[in-house]
């Protein structure tokens, strides 16, 4: 029995990824050469001359002033980072176990693991959250799994990781700006995390650019399913919608930021200039080029319909706070 059309399509895409291995090695080498490897203890420990107990007391005193809406944003950012096992699994399915893809996936996993660790350690040391509730949320999030509709298509995986890494970078960076006046130490942590997310974003965006060069019609078709909207990894966690709403109302991350991200990728990948496409590619190209206007209308609608709301989260000690 021969392969089905969908199976042939999948194997064709896997072949393209294999062809990309030399480029993966180049990008990985460049990534490591530019990187300054940091560890969570670089930010959380006291200076050698300082008293450890006093260091913790002062850190808690500064963190106490962080507003609850920003704490809620930080909780969602942290839990999103703790979903790393889901992404390692998704990438490992297509990247294989004996290639530079495996080397990249392992490196990316090791780097990303520090993001969740440093944020988790910081919030525990500063008593920023109800720690038991945070851990329960993390447990349930991982237990529920992450099974997106695109996980059967390796091209969609890379289109998704491109925009998801950029969105995560935006959220960490803006959260860092919001906490800077209260706790410069946390702002520094978030700045380092955001800058590393930016480097990961650059890697995945370049990979998808290379896929477009090799298989433009199928690449555009895959991207046309991802770019209209993405479910962030934490969408399955309890309270996600309200946490995301707080982030939007705070101006940390929302529909207009996603619009910027999509516009940025359309420009970088030069989607409007691609020619020589077959019917599949032309239809996908037209769909993608129409996405920004649709996202703009969504952002306008959300902002117009938004009304003042009161929130409370167990992880932020059930304290109520109102937001316009």
Model-predicted regions and their roles:
Residues 1-324:
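Non-heme di-metal
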């Amino acid at each position: 029995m021969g392969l089905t059309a969908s199976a042939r399509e999948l194997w064709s895409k896997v072949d393209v990824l294999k062809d990309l291995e030399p480029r993966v090695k180049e990008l990985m080498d460049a990534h490591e050469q530019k990187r300054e490897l940091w560890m969570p203890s670089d930010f959380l420990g006291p200076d050698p001359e300082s008293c450890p107990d006093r260091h913790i007391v002062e850190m808690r005193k500064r963190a106490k002033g962080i507003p609850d809406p920003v704490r809620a944003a930080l909780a969602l950012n942290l839990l999103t980072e703790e979903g790393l096992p889901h992404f390692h699994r998704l990438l490992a399915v297509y990247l294989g176990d004996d290639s530079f893809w495996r080397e990249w996936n392992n490196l990316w996993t090791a780097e990303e693991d520090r993001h969740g660790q440093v944020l988790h350690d910081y919030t525990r040391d500063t008593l920023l959250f109800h720690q038991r509730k945070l851990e329960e949320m993390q447990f349930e999030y991982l237990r529920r799994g992450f099974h997106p509709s695109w996980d059967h298509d390796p091209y969609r995986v890379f289109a998704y990781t491109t925009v998801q890494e950029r969105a995560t970078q935006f959220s960490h960076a803006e959260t860092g700006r919001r906490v800077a006046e209260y706790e410069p130490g946390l702002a520094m942590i978030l700045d380092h995390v955001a800058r590393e997310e930016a480097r990961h974003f650059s890697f995945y965006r370049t990979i998808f650019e290379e896929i477009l060069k090799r298989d433009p019609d199928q690449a555009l078709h895959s991207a046309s399913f991802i770019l209209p909207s993405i479910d962030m990894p934490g969408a399955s966690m309890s309270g996600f919608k309200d946490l995301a709403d707080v982030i939007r109302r705070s101006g940390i991350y929302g529909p207009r930021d996603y619009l910027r991200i999509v516009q940025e990728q359309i420009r970088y990948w030069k989607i409007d200039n691609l020619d020589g496409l077959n019917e599949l590619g032309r239809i996908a190209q037209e769909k993608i080029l129409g996405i920004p206007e649709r996202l703009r209308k969504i952002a306008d609608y959300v902002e117009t319909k938004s009304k003042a709301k009161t929130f409370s989260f167990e992880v932020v000690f059930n304290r109520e706070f109102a937001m316009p």
